[in-house]
A protein has these predicted regions:
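Intrinsically disordered, low-complexity regulatory segments enriched in Ser/Thr/Pro
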Residues: 130-138
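Short acidic/polar capping segments at secondary-structure boundaries
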Residues: 116-118, 140-143
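Compact, glycine/acidic-enriched structural inserts
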Residues: 136, 143-163
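Acidic, proline/glycine-rich low-complexity IDRs
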Residues: 165-197
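Short, flexible helical or helix-coil boundary motifs
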Residues: 15-18, 22, 157, 161, ...
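Short strand-connecting beta-turns/loops that link adjacent beta-strands
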Residues: 117, 128-129
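A surface-exposed partner-binding patch
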Residues: 1-117, 186-197
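Short, surface-exposed beta-strand/loop micro-motifs that present aromatic residues
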Residues: 120-126
């Protein structure tokens, strides 16, 4: 089992024990052929971690309250998008006539987590030997690195909730241990500062 799937399973197990209602928002995954058929019109390839994530969970509709909103951040860019929604909004990222057109070092971005205005994206056509970074796109079209890659994002989440570095029940970080969270974040994203957009 990969570190990505293992960390996702850790999150699910923790939620089933501590917040069973939240765990119910985790949808079943798609098969590889279902994923491929939903994104077949994409003009670029996506990294292996993308397929692994969607085989674990198919995501949720935009209006569904999910675990991701409470685990990762106080912002709205943390709900795992269904592929239907991601495919609906991604053309805005690549259409140069759109105000929200954006890319990462000349490569396309695909919105895997998000809301109607802010997104966490994976990089398309990523050919580096390392996994794709996760890039945050704000509603004012600024980009910055959120996580070194998708695995580091989930490792950060799993360890943070298990160590009680974040209070899962809050909508903001009023009840979080900033020092402990930062320690966990930089443990799994130690070279984040080396990356630049």
């Amino acid at each position: 089992m990969s570190l990505l799937t293992d960390s996702l399973n850790q999150i699910q197990t923790w939620l089933e024990t501590n917040y069973p209602l939240a765990a119910e928002s985790i949808t079943p995954g798609l098969t590889l052929s279902e994923i491929e058929s939903k994104i077949e019109t994409l003009p670029f390839s996506l990294p292996e971690e993308f397929y692994e994530l969607y085989q674990w969970s198919r995501g949720n509709s935009l209006n569904t309250k999910t675990i991701y909103t409470d685990i990762f951040s106080a912002d709205d860019a943390t709900s795992l998008n269904s592929l239907e929604y991601a495919m609906e909004v991604f053309p805005d990222f690549v259409d140069e006539d759109e105000d929200c057109a954006v890319n990462y070092i000349g490569k396309p971005l695909f919105p895997i987590f998000g809301s109607d205005a802010t997104f966490h994206c994976i990089v398309g056509d990523w050919e580096d030997k390392t996994p794709s970074p996760i890039v945050y796109v704000s509603e004012i079209i600024e980009t910055n690195h959120s996580y070194v890659n998708l695995t580091s994002m989930m490792l950060t989440a799993a360890e943070s909730i298990q160590a009680k570095a974040i209070d899962f029940n809050t909508k903001t970080y009023k009840n979080w241990n900033e020092e402990k969270y930062a320690e966990i974040y930089f443990k799994h994203n130690s070279n984040i500062l080396e990356l630049s957009v």
